[in-house]
Amino acid sequence: MAMQMQLEANADTSVEEESFGPQPISRLEQCGINANDVKKLEEAGFHTVEAVAYAPKKELINIKGISEAKADKILAEAAKLVPMGFTTATEFHQRRSEIIQITTGSKELDKLLQGGIETGSITEMFGEFRTGKTQICHTLAVTCQLPIDRGGGEGKAMYIDTEGTFRPERLLAVAERYGLSGSDVLDNVAYARAFNTDHQTQLLYQASAMMVESRYALLIVDSATALYRTDYSGRGELSARQMHLARFLRMLLRLADEFGVAVVITNQVVAQVDGAAMFAADPKKPIGGNIIAHASTTRLYLRKGRGETRICKIYDSPCLPEAEAMFAINADGVGDAKD
């Protein structure tokens, strides 16, 4: 009798565990969805049941060969596999306490972020050139591979580079600092160069397929907005630009929700040249407007300090107080500033 209860308890926990990890799209076939329809979903970029459950019906109907009735059936089956209803704040609090934080390499910066870069959400870093945005990205691409007890995420990193600033040599220097094998670290980083805004979005579909295959802890887009500044120009194209950017950020948020990866994006700043700039203490503001502001969970403002020191300020966060921390850019990545 005790044995049976134990087995039932084990079965319950395994069901619970399954409901939290991303489930491959092939699970829908077991629920009576036609194999051809599942293939169509996969070709359209839906690689997990979660991706289907989180998608609006309109998106499924746009797939060639999926009628409204089929879309309804697919969404109904996906909803059975993915818990999307209400839960108590206690349960949610429990789930939040299990969230992994990835170290930035600087103790002061980690303290400011209450542990590091949070997985399952979008962290945006913005600032002028030479403020350390890309250096933090390079350091994170290595620290996310560390064991959890050393402040890592025990997963691979994915790096989408839009400005051609990715340097594997920097990763090797950071790997040496943490006593990791350089070749293993480089093997665990998937790198892609994005050449235009459509390509940048297309890469996220590939990212989703790769995340199903192996465990990724971090997705970096450096910089998320650079190509939007050149592909769309003038006020006439502003609305089209913001819609495209909103779609890109929505996909990033979906990847963070689906796979629990930490998404880190960098953003550039624009100088305000209107009359109001004369009265502002700092006339620079991040580009992308309200759309990027609402999509990011945590926004960090980086600025130059003296010498190699940089200052990071929490610009916007749902739970972190507005505060500042100093860090330094060293030969072996981001570290603490020396007094």
From Swiss-Prot:
One of its GO terms (biological process) is meiotic cell cycle. Changing K58R: Impaired ubiquitination. The modification N-acetylalanine is found at A2. Induction: Stress-induced increase in the mitochondrial levels is seen. Changing T131P: In FANCR; causes dominant negative loss of function in interstrand cross-link repair; shows high basal DNA-independent ATPase activity; results in decreased DNA binding. One of its GO terms (cellular component) is chromatin. Changing R150Q: In BC; decreased ATPase activity in the presence of stoichiometric ss-DNA concentrations with respect to RAD51; 3 to 4-fold decrease of affinity for ATP. Plays an important role in homologous strand exchange, a key step in DNA repair through homologous recombination (HR). Binds to single-stranded DNA in an ATP-dependent manner to form nucleoprotein filaments which are essential for the homology search and strand exchange. Catalyzes the recognition of homology and strand exchange between homologous DNA partners to form a joint molecule between a processed DNA break and the repair template. Recruited to resolve stalled replication forks during replication stress. NCBIfam families: PRK04301.1 (NF003301), recomb_RAD51 (TIGR02239). This is DNA repair protein RAD51 homolog 1. It comes from Homo sapiens. The gene is RAD51.
